Design a protein with these regions (language model features):
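Helix-coil boundary and interhelical linker segments in multi-pass alpha-helical membrane proteins
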Residues: 1-6, 70-78
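Alpha-helical transmembrane segments
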Residues: 2-18, 86-90
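Membrane-water interface of transmembrane alpha-helices
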Residues: 16-33, 101
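Cytosolic juxtamembrane segments of membrane proteins
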Residues: 31-38, 104-110
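Short membrane-interface loop/juxtamembrane segments of multi-pass integral membrane proteins
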Residues: 36-50
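Select subsegments of transmembrane alpha-helices in polytopic membrane proteins
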Residues: 47-60
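Transmembrane alpha-helical segments of integral membrane proteins
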Residues: 61-72
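Alpha-helical transmembrane segments and their immediate juxtamembrane interface regions
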Residues: 77-110
Length: 110
């Protein structure tokens, strides 16, 4: 459905935009408790890692939306077989990178 494509494009695009903001060292898109104990000199590195994770999640959602739209038009299951693992893998990898950064620089999630 077209609404699914639009939703995935919006959610994925927002995640990519927020990740890009974080990668510049601007942590304003995060809750304060996610970076409360991050040292000032580590904020840039922390932002890069969290931003990379967020961009990875956003890109996987965006690509998944496009692949599911193609599936709806072609009814070829190959798009599901490619899109679903890509979505799950992107979310898991992106979350892992973000959590790694939080544990490394913030000494925990909270």
């Amino acid at each position: 459905m077209l609404i699914g494509l639009i939703t995935c494009l919006l959610v994925g695009g927002l995640c990519i935009a927020f990740g890009a903001v974080n990668m510049t060292g601007n942590l304003s898109t995060l809750h304060a408790y996610h970076y409360r104990r991050v040292k000032e000199q580590d904020k840039k590195a922390f932002g890069r890692l969290v931003g990379l994770g967020t961009i990875l999640v956003g890109a996987s959602v965006l690509i998944y939306g496009v692949l599911m739209y193609v599936y709806e038009k072609t009814q070829s299951n190959v798009w599901i077989w490619v899109g679903t693992p890509l979505l799950i893998g992107g979310i898991v990898a992106g979350a892992a990178i973000s959590f790694y950064a939080m544990f490394k620089y913030n000494k925990g999630i909270f």
